[in-house]
């Protein structure tokens, strides 16, 4: 009681929704739809790739018809499994793209962000996409340092 889940003997309890009273005091009483899975594993959650399993469940791959593929299978990729590329979008300013990533396993991590496209500069930004520091961009690769569970926003122009 008081946590999101509890296992006792052969019983399992799982909290599916928690809701505040603002702006809707009856949100927890309305109709909701959930997708959840039980994912048994022998090793620690990090080694069992639990974050990847959750993404596969909640955001399945969608095939679309497209033009000629580029040299990469994605617009961007990282070389560390504990770094999750969360967002790739056009910059709010209309110039460049934003790539948002986070560290998922509570580990200080250095990763190489590989991007497809012709970009001249890379910046680390805050969540409002305001440039804070320039990053080295060489041959489509940007080295990014992430603190445990940190969200990092990179802008490429």
For the regions a language model picked out, list residue spans one by one.
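Terminal accessory/anchoring regions of large secretory-pathway or extracellular enzymes
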Residues: 3-4, 8-157
């Amino acid at each position: 009681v008081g946590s999101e889940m509890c296992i006792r003997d052969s019983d399992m309890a799982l909290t599916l929704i928690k809701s505040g009273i603002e702006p809707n005091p009856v949100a927890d009483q309305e109709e909701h739809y959930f997708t959840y899975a039980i994912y048994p594993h022998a090793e620690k959650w990090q080694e069992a790739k639990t974050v990847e399993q959750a993404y596969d469940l909640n955001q399945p791959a969608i095939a679309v018809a497209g033009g000629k593929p580029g040299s990469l299978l994605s617009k961007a990729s990282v070389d560390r499994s504990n770094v999750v590329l969360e967002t790739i979008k056009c910059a709010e300013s209309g110039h460049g793209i934003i790539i948002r990533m986070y560290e998922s396993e509570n580990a200080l991590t250095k990763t190489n962000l590989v991007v497809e496209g012709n970009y001249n500069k890379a910046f680390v930004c805050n969540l409002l996409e305001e440039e804070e520091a320039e990053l080295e961009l060489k041959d489509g690769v940007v080295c990014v340092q992430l603190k445990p569970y940190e969200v990092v926003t990179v802008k490429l122009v």
